């Protein structure tokens, strides 16, 4: 019975070792930032019918262009238009092939179709994904913002 316990312990350690090594825990250099610090999110209204999503990206990190997804949780009847994503930099990814990425910062303008011209509050949900140059990619992360849109003179975009 003792041999089975030892064998199990060795197998568990061998299974966990690659994941722990990839995280580089305890290293004085090359430590990974928490995702909220590596990819600092903010969002605000830029017009009565548009919002802007901003990510400040830490040095040594990048975000994937095609991993951004946007959704409105409120108000009913409001819809997002097509996000205006900047060009970015093409990177050859060993797993995904050629991918467009952003470094340092990215700003994305999103038109908003409103059901009425009155002032309203939006609840925006943004899903994004980024990686560190160390070779570690974060799981997709969700960010949320409550944004106040001023009254507009006309309805829609």
Regions found by a protein language model. Name each.
Residues 12-20:
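Hydrophobic h-region of N-terminal signal peptides that target proteins for export
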